[in-house]
């Protein structure tokens, strides 16, 4: 109780019907996420033709999403059943840490997937091919940096606390400069910087794809045929398709996490607008991003 901010005590208990609705949503989300990401990992690891350096990043993405839902799903179900957080202060901190860690690892994995597509499509033969060693180094870097940032609240730079009485996360209601400085930097690290890199890469990817397609049409017109699709062109077309998949995946991630980012910033600067209902659904909606990735890659 000592970790719960006074802000949450001013609100009456939520409508009892909200919890069954939340429980059903989490049940569907949890099953889809665990099954989808497990299948993704299994297929990529057991199909020799798919065991490429670039797909190591896809496997890492599926693993971080699987870990997120594996650790978030059961506690959320318990919370929905009892209508409040009942798992204690220590597990609250561990729960929040794992959620932040997996979210951070997922977004940076998708950023590196996007950068790899940028390297292949925009730079072409001039770009350095992604090797297994380089992909492994990227993945190691992602997890080391993610752990470094997410472990900081355990050492006094911000802290993990209950939010909305049903979940746990970073302390965005604290008014001290040290706590807020963590949220400023962390928001930049897991949202604004990845977004900037993603937009930059996709702008040039789209330009490269458009230029390639125009060149293909012009060449076909000169040869007096309707299309020009040799083996190299088909390969380029496949790369472009993968770029669209990566773009869709990253876009869905940002759509999922933007509400939670806004909750953090509203909590810092306009907490009177922040109710448990908004917090809970923003939090749950953010976790649902782990469902999107296997669906997008399965369609491909």
From Swiss-Prot:
Entry keywords, A to Z: Cell membrane, Cell projection, Chromophore, Disulfide bond, G-protein coupled receptor, Membrane, Phosphoprotein, Photoreceptor protein, Receptor, Retinal protein, Sensory transduction, Transducer, Transmembrane, Transmembrane helix, Vision
Recorded family membership: Belongs to the G-protein coupled receptor 1 family. Opsin subfamily.
Task of the protein: Photoreceptor required for image-forming vision at low light intensity. Can use both retinal and 3-dehydroretinal as visual pigment. Light-induced isomerization of 11-cis to all-trans retinal triggers a conformational change that activates signaling via G-proteins. Signaling via GNAQ probably mediates the activation of phospholipase C.
Keyword field contains Glycosyltransferase: no
Stretches in topological domain Cytoplasmic: 44-55, 116-134, 204-244
Family matches, as Gene3D superfamilies: Rhodopsin 7-helix transmembrane proteins
Gene: RHO
GO molecular function, one term: G protein-coupled receptor activity
Extent of motif 'Ionic lock' involved in activated form stabilization: 116-118
Pfam families: 7tm_1
InterPro entries per record: GPCR_opsins, GPCR_Rhodpsn, GPCR_Rhodpsn_7TM, Opsin, Opsin_lateye, Retinal_BS
Membrane disposition: Multi-pass membrane protein
Entry-linked PANTHER family: OPSIN (PTHR24240)
S-S pairs: 92-168
BP-aspect Gene Ontology terms: phototransduction; visual perception
The organism's taxonomic lineage, starting at the top: Eukaryota, Metazoa, Ecdysozoa, Arthropoda, Crustacea
Protein name: Rhodopsin
Post-translational modification: Contains one covalently linked retinal chromophore.
Highest taxon of source: Eukaryota
Subcellular location: Cell projection, Rhabdomere membrane
Spans traversing the lipid bilayer: 19-43, 56-78, 93-115, 135-155, 182-203, 245-266, 278-299
Extracellular side stretches: 1-18, 79-92, 156-181, 267-277
Sites bearing N6-(retinylidene)lysine, chain numbering: 287
Main location group: membrane
Any one cellular-component term (Gene Ontology): cell projection
Subunit (UniProt): Homodimer. Interacts with GNAQ.
């Amino acid at each position: 109780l000592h970790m719960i901010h006074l802000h949450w005590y001013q609100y009456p208990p939520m409508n009892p019907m909200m919890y069954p609705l939340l429980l059903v949503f989490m049940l569907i989300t949890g099953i889809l996420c665990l099954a989808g990401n497990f299948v993704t990992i299994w297929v990529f690891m057991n199909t020799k033709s798919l065991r490429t350096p670039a797909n190591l990043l896809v496997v890492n993405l599926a693993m971080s999403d699987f870990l997120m839902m594996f650790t978030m799903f059961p506690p959320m179900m318990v919370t929905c059943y009892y209508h409040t957080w009942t798992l204690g202060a220590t597990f609250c901190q561990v729960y929040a840490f794992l959620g932040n860690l997996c979210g951070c690892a997922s977004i940076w994995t998708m950023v590196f997937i996007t950068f790899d597509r940028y390297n292949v499509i925009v730079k072409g033969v001039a770009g350095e091919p992604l090797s297994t060693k380089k992909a492994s180094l990227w993945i190691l870097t992602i997890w080391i940096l993610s752990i470094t940032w997410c472990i900081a609240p355990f050492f006094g730079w911000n802290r993990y606390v209950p939010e909305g009485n049903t979940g746990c996360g970073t302390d965005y209601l604290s008014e001290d400069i040290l706590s807020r400085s963590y949220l400023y930097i962390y928001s930049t690290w897991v949202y604004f910087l990845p977004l900037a890199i993603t937009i930059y890469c996709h702008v040039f990817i789209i330009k490269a794809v458009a230029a390639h397609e125009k060149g293909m049409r012009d060449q076909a017109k000169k040869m007096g045929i309707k299309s020009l699709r040799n083996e190299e062109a088909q390969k380029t077309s496949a790369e472009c398709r993968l770029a669209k998949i990566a773009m869709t995946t990253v876009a869905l991630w940002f759509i999922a996490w933007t509400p939670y980012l806004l909750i953090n910033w509203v909590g810092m600067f306009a907490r009177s607008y922040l109710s448990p209902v908004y917090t809970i659904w923003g939090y749950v909606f953010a976790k649902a991003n782990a469902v999107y990735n296997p669906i997008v890659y399965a369609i491909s």
